[in-house]
Regions:
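Extended, subdomain-level signal for the structured scaffold at the beginning of enzyme domains
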Residues: 1-95, 102-107, 123-125, 133-135, ...
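Positions that flank functional sites
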Residues: 39, 120, 141
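Structural detector of well-ordered beta-strand residues that form the stable sheet scaffold
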Residues: 95-96, 117, 134, 145
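Active-site-proximal catalytic alpha-helix in oxidoreductases
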Residues: 100-102, 146-158
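A conserved active-site-flanking secondary-structure segment within enzyme catalytic domains
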Residues: 111-138
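Alpha-helix boundary/capping and short turn/kink residues
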Residues: 116, 150, 163-167
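Amphipathic alpha-helical segments enriched in hydrophobic/aromatic residues interleaved with Lys/Arg
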Residues: 136-150
């Protein structure tokens, strides 16, 4: 299996790295980071990730994954990226996203008539792209799998491994990375979190949204 994870400046690192850690542990699966231009990109907070190939070098993939992050905004009108996604989608077994990455799939026209999810703060905008937004950790509709925010990418990736390699392999990978969540708080969804916590998160997002998007220059 050949997996291409699209990375870009101001991505949410966990959106890419979480699924990467799951899928790279499957025997004979090759996972690589790709970007508009080969080389380093800087995630939110400054973490550097290296794209081994530029998207114009990638004609096909078994799986393509689009992470989320504040860097998604310019991608929604970036025809170079959107055209590439449409092209590579014709070759994929699975087209996937994490968090706000589903908006990019939508902008590429890949979610029309499909059930899809994403970060809880961007579910409604998915309607603008013809998608049917739903909640949940991940949603599979045809060959498209969209995951909710950040850590949901791990759940989605384990589901994908189970679909392709079987549940035993997926369980072995889960144990290998010791993915056994037991958080100290039960506030991991807006339905569970107290209203004041929901509003605090919204204020954090609004503040971060003012951060200029890096061009990588």
């Amino acid at each position: 299996m050949q997996i291409a994870i699209l990375i870009f400046d101001k991505l949410a690192a966990q959106d890419a790295v979480g699924p990467y850690e799951v899928m790279r542990n499957v025997p004979e699966w090759n996972v690589e980071f790709v970007a508009k231009r080969k080389g380093e990109v800087r995630a939110e907070g400054g973490l550097g990730l290296i794209a081994d190939r530029a998207i114009d070098e990638v004609d096909s993939a078994d799986v393509v994954l689009v992470p989320g992050g504040f860097g998604n905004r310019p991608m929604l009108t970036d025809e170079e990226i959107l055209s590439w996604l449409r092209r590579v989608d014709t070759t994929t077994k699975w087209t996937t996203s994490v968090c706000t990455g589903s908006l990019v799939l939508g902008a590429a026209g890949l979610l029309k008539g499909k059930r899809a999810t994403g970060n809880w703060m961007v579910l409604d905008p998915l309607r603008d792209y013809g998608a049917d937004p739903v909640g949940g950790r991940f949603v599979e509709d045809g060959k498209v799998i969209t995951a909710a925010g950040v850590t949901a990418g791990i759940d989605m990736a384990l589901h994908l491994v189970a679909r392709e390699a079987g549940p035993e392999v997926a369980q072995a990978v889960q144990l290998g990375i010791e993915y056994d969540p037991d958080p100290p708080f039960d506030s991991g969804s807006p339905e569970k979190a107290p209203p004041e916590i929901v509003e605090l998160v919204r204020s954090f997002a609004a503040a971060n949204d003012q951060t200029p998007v890096s061009t990588g220059d």
